[in-house]
Amino acid sequence: MVFNVNILTIFPEMFPGTLGYSVIGKALNKGIWNLNVIDIRSFATDKHKTVDDKPYGGGPGMIMKADVIGSAIDNVLSTNKETKLIYMSPSGVKLNQDISGQLAHFSNITILCGRFEGIDRRVLDFYDFYEISIGDYILSGGEVASMVLIETCVRLIPGVVSNVDSIRDESFTASYGLEYSQYTRPANWRGLEVPSVLVSGNHKKINLWKTQQSYRITKQRRPELTNTADGDIYE
Protein backbone atom coordinates (compact mmCIF):
# COMPACT_ATOMS: atom_id res chain seq x y z
CA MET A 1 0.00 0.00 0.00
CA VAL A 2 1.34 3.41 -1.00
CA PHE A 3 1.09 6.18 1.61
CA ASN A 4 -0.45 9.16 -0.20
CA VAL A 5 -0.08 12.67 1.23
CA ASN A 6 -1.95 15.73 -0.05
CA ILE A 7 -0.74 19.16 1.06
CA LEU A 8 -2.96 22.25 0.90
CA THR A 9 -0.79 25.37 1.06
CA ILE A 10 -0.31 28.86 -0.37
CA PHE A 11 3.42 28.13 -0.69
CA PRO A 12 3.65 24.96 -2.81
CA GLU A 13 7.27 25.75 -3.70
CA MET A 14 8.27 24.84 -0.14
CA PHE A 15 7.75 21.15 -0.93
CA PRO A 16 9.19 18.56 -0.85
CA GLY A 17 11.85 20.56 1.03
CA THR A 18 13.53 18.40 3.66
CA LEU A 19 11.27 15.51 2.66
CA GLY A 20 13.33 15.12 -0.51
CA TYR A 21 16.44 14.04 1.39
CA SER A 22 17.85 10.95 3.12
CA VAL A 23 15.64 7.89 3.67
CA ILE A 24 12.41 9.90 3.31
CA GLY A 25 13.48 11.27 -0.07
CA LYS A 26 14.65 7.85 -1.25
CA ALA A 27 11.29 6.36 -0.26
CA LEU A 28 9.54 9.12 -2.20
CA ASN A 29 11.62 8.38 -5.30
CA LYS A 30 10.90 4.65 -4.94
CA GLY A 31 7.15 5.26 -4.78
CA ILE A 32 6.75 3.95 -1.23
CA TRP A 33 4.91 7.18 -0.51
CA ASN A 34 3.49 9.89 -2.73
CA LEU A 35 3.32 13.68 -2.29
CA ASN A 36 0.61 15.77 -3.96
CA VAL A 37 0.99 19.52 -3.33
CA ILE A 38 -2.04 21.71 -4.00
CA ASP A 39 -1.89 25.51 -4.27
CA ILE A 40 -4.83 26.98 -2.35
CA ARG A 41 -4.55 30.23 -4.33
CA SER A 42 -5.56 28.43 -7.51
CA PHE A 43 -9.06 28.12 -6.04
CA ALA A 44 -9.50 31.86 -5.42
CA THR A 45 -11.97 33.38 -7.89
CA ASP A 46 -10.96 37.07 -7.93
CA LYS A 47 -8.24 38.51 -10.15
CA HIS A 48 -5.91 39.07 -7.19
CA LYS A 49 -6.22 35.43 -6.03
CA THR A 50 -7.19 36.56 -2.52
CA VAL A 51 -7.10 33.85 0.15
CA ASP A 52 -7.53 35.95 3.30
CA ASP A 53 -9.73 38.69 4.78
CA LYS A 54 -10.19 40.73 7.96
CA PRO A 55 -11.61 38.87 10.98
CA TYR A 56 -15.21 39.44 12.06
CA GLY A 57 -15.30 41.19 15.42
CA GLY A 58 -11.97 42.87 14.82
CA GLY A 59 -8.52 41.82 15.87
CA PRO A 60 -5.00 41.70 14.45
CA GLY A 61 -4.00 40.03 11.22
CA MET A 62 -5.98 38.27 8.54
CA ILE A 63 -7.96 35.02 8.41
CA MET A 64 -7.86 32.49 5.56
CA LYS A 65 -11.20 32.42 3.74
CA ALA A 66 -13.64 29.53 4.11
CA ASP A 67 -14.92 29.67 0.53
CA VAL A 68 -11.46 29.40 -1.05
CA ILE A 69 -10.20 26.66 1.26
CA GLY A 70 -13.50 24.80 1.01
CA SER A 71 -13.15 24.64 -2.77
CA ALA A 72 -9.62 23.27 -2.43
CA ILE A 73 -10.77 20.60 0.01
CA ASP A 74 -13.72 19.64 -2.19
CA ASN A 75 -11.28 19.12 -5.04
CA VAL A 76 -9.28 16.66 -2.95
CA LEU A 77 -12.39 14.85 -1.72
CA SER A 78 -13.69 14.45 -5.27
CA THR A 79 -11.01 11.81 -5.87
CA ASN A 80 -10.13 10.79 -2.29
CA LYS A 81 -13.33 10.57 -0.25
CA GLU A 82 -11.70 8.49 2.50
CA THR A 83 -8.69 10.78 3.03
CA LYS A 84 -7.88 11.71 6.63
CA LEU A 85 -8.14 15.50 7.01
CA ILE A 86 -5.50 17.07 9.26
CA TYR A 87 -4.90 20.69 10.23
CA MET A 88 -1.59 21.75 11.76
CA SER A 89 -2.55 23.97 14.70
CA PRO A 90 -0.95 25.09 18.00
CA SER A 91 -4.27 24.29 19.67
CA GLY A 92 -4.35 20.73 18.35
CA VAL A 93 -3.49 17.42 20.00
CA LYS A 94 0.25 17.27 20.63
CA LEU A 95 1.97 14.94 18.17
CA ASN A 96 3.54 11.80 19.58
CA GLN A 97 4.82 8.47 18.28
CA ASP A 98 1.47 6.75 18.80
CA ILE A 99 -0.34 9.30 16.62
CA SER A 100 2.31 8.96 13.91
CA GLY A 101 1.94 5.19 14.00
CA GLN A 102 -1.83 5.42 13.61
CA LEU A 103 -1.65 7.88 10.71
CA ALA A 104 0.99 5.78 8.94
CA HIS A 105 -1.65 3.07 8.49
CA PHE A 106 -3.88 5.35 6.40
CA SER A 107 -3.55 5.06 2.64
CA ASN A 108 -4.36 8.74 2.14
CA ILE A 109 -4.04 11.82 4.35
CA THR A 110 -4.59 15.51 3.56
CA ILE A 111 -2.79 18.19 5.55
CA LEU A 112 -4.05 21.77 5.56
CA CYS A 113 -1.35 24.36 6.24
CA GLY A 114 -2.61 27.61 7.71
CA ARG A 115 -1.05 31.06 7.43
CA PHE A 116 -1.69 34.56 8.78
CA GLU A 117 -3.84 34.39 11.95
CA GLY A 118 -5.31 31.04 10.99
CA ILE A 119 -8.27 29.42 9.21
CA ASP A 120 -11.95 30.35 9.34
CA ARG A 121 -13.19 27.98 12.05
CA ARG A 122 -16.18 26.94 9.96
CA VAL A 123 -13.89 25.03 7.61
CA LEU A 124 -12.48 22.90 10.41
CA ASP A 125 -15.92 22.19 11.85
CA PHE A 126 -17.64 21.49 8.53
CA TYR A 127 -15.05 18.95 7.38
CA ASP A 128 -14.27 17.58 10.85
CA PHE A 129 -10.53 18.12 10.70
CA TYR A 130 -8.18 16.35 13.11
CA GLU A 131 -6.00 19.12 14.59
CA ILE A 132 -2.38 18.35 15.45
CA SER A 133 0.29 20.46 17.16
CA ILE A 134 4.02 19.71 17.06
CA GLY A 135 4.72 21.66 20.26
CA ASP A 136 3.95 24.57 22.53
CA TYR A 137 5.31 27.32 20.30
CA ILE A 138 4.21 29.35 17.28
CA LEU A 139 5.37 29.07 13.67
CA SER A 140 4.51 31.43 10.81
CA GLY A 141 2.61 28.67 9.03
CA GLY A 142 1.79 24.99 8.94
CA GLU A 143 4.22 23.95 6.22
CA VAL A 144 7.24 23.16 8.42
CA ALA A 145 4.97 21.46 10.96
CA SER A 146 3.46 19.32 8.21
CA MET A 147 6.94 18.18 7.15
CA VAL A 148 7.62 17.07 10.71
CA LEU A 149 4.38 15.10 10.77
CA ILE A 150 4.99 13.51 7.39
CA GLU A 151 8.52 12.41 8.27
CA THR A 152 7.43 10.83 11.54
CA CYS A 153 4.79 8.83 9.64
CA VAL A 154 6.79 7.85 6.56
CA ARG A 155 9.76 6.45 8.47
CA LEU A 156 7.40 3.96 10.15
CA ILE A 157 6.31 2.51 6.80
CA PRO A 158 7.92 -0.89 6.08
CA GLY A 159 10.84 -0.57 3.67
CA VAL A 160 11.69 3.06 4.48
CA VAL A 161 14.15 2.41 7.31
CA SER A 162 16.17 -0.67 6.39
CA ASN A 163 17.00 -1.72 9.95
CA VAL A 164 13.73 -2.31 11.84
CA ASP A 165 15.67 -2.46 15.12
CA SER A 166 16.48 1.23 14.62
CA ILE A 167 12.79 2.07 14.91
CA ARG A 168 12.09 -0.37 17.74
CA ASP A 169 14.86 1.04 19.95
CA GLU A 170 14.22 4.74 19.30
CA SER A 171 13.00 7.31 21.79
CA PHE A 172 9.24 7.06 22.48
CA THR A 173 9.22 3.57 20.93
CA ALA A 174 11.47 1.82 23.43
CA SER A 175 10.11 0.51 26.74
CA TYR A 176 11.01 3.57 28.77
CA GLY A 177 10.37 6.41 26.37
CA LEU A 178 13.74 8.02 25.64
CA GLU A 179 16.56 6.22 23.89
CA TYR A 180 19.75 5.17 25.68
CA SER A 181 23.02 7.03 24.99
CA GLN A 182 24.94 6.02 21.85
CA TYR A 183 28.69 5.76 21.18
CA THR A 184 31.00 4.88 18.28
CA ARG A 185 34.75 4.79 17.49
CA PRO A 186 37.21 5.96 18.74
CA ALA A 187 36.86 4.27 22.12
CA ASN A 188 38.78 7.12 23.78
CA TRP A 189 38.08 10.69 22.69
CA ARG A 190 39.75 13.58 24.53
CA GLY A 191 40.10 11.43 27.61
CA LEU A 192 36.46 10.32 27.58
CA GLU A 193 36.03 6.54 27.46
CA VAL A 194 33.13 4.58 26.01
CA PRO A 195 31.32 2.72 28.85
CA SER A 196 33.25 -0.50 29.34
CA VAL A 197 30.13 -2.68 29.24
CA LEU A 198 29.55 -1.75 25.59
CA VAL A 199 32.90 -3.25 24.55
CA SER A 200 32.64 -6.26 26.87
CA GLY A 201 30.95 -8.55 24.37
CA ASN A 202 28.44 -9.63 27.03
CA HIS A 203 25.13 -9.03 25.27
CA LYS A 204 23.03 -9.73 28.34
CA LYS A 205 24.86 -7.02 30.29
CA ILE A 206 24.76 -4.67 27.30
CA ASN A 207 20.99 -5.03 26.96
CA LEU A 208 20.52 -4.44 30.69
CA TRP A 209 22.72 -1.33 30.50
CA LYS A 210 20.66 0.02 27.59
CA THR A 211 17.42 -0.54 29.51
CA GLN A 212 18.83 1.14 32.62
CA GLN A 213 20.13 4.08 30.58
CA SER A 214 16.80 4.50 28.82
CA TYR A 215 14.92 4.50 32.11
CA ARG A 216 17.27 6.89 33.90
CA ILE A 217 17.35 9.40 31.04
CA THR A 218 13.57 9.30 30.74
CA LYS A 219 13.06 9.66 34.50
CA GLN A 220 15.38 12.67 34.58
CA ARG A 221 14.13 14.51 31.48
CA ARG A 222 10.58 13.24 30.91
CA PRO A 223 9.41 11.66 34.20
CA GLU A 224 5.79 11.55 33.03
CA LEU A 225 6.80 8.82 30.57
CA THR A 226 8.10 6.41 33.22
CA ASN A 227 6.17 3.74 35.08
CA THR A 228 7.22 4.37 38.67
CA ALA A 229 5.65 1.10 39.82
CA ASP A 230 8.22 -0.86 37.80
CA GLY A 231 11.09 1.57 37.92
CA ASP A 232 12.99 0.44 41.02
CA ILE A 233 14.59 -2.53 39.30
CA TYR A 234 16.28 -0.16 36.83
CA GLU A 235 17.74 2.21 39.42
Swiss-Prot record:
The terms describing its cellular component in GO are: cytosol
> Which GO molecular function annotations are given, in alphabetical order?
tRNA (guanine(37)-N1)-methyltransferase activity
Q: Record's InterPro entries?
A: Alpha/beta_knot_MTases, tRNA_m1G_MeTrfase_C_sf, tRNA_m1G_MeTrfase_TrmD, tRNA_m1G_MTases_N, tRNA_MeTrfase_TRMD/TRM10
Main subcellular localization, coarse class? cytoplasm
Keyword GTP-binding set for record: no
- Catalyzed reactions per annotation: guanosine(37) in tRNA + S-adenosyl-L-methionine = N(1)-methylguanosine(37) in tRNA + S-adenosyl-L-homocysteine + H(+)
Where found?
A: Cytoplasm
Q: What class of enzyme is it?
A: transferase
SUPFAM superfamilies (UniProt xref): alpha/beta knot (SSF75217)
Annotated coiled-coil positions are none
Q: Does the keyword Methyltransferase apply?
A: yes
Residues that hold S-adenosyl-L-methionine according to the record? 114, 134-139
Q: Which family does it belong to?
A: Belongs to the RNA methyltransferase TrmD family.
Quaternary data:
Homodimer.
Q: What does this protein do?
A: Specifically methylates guanosine-37 in various tRNAs.
What PANTHER family does the record point to?
Answer: TRNA (GUANINE-N(1)-)-METHYLTRANSFERASE
Q: What is this protein called?
A: tRNA (guanine-N(1)-)-methyltransferase
Task: Give the organism, scientific name.
Answer: Ehrlichia ruminantium (strain Welgevonden)
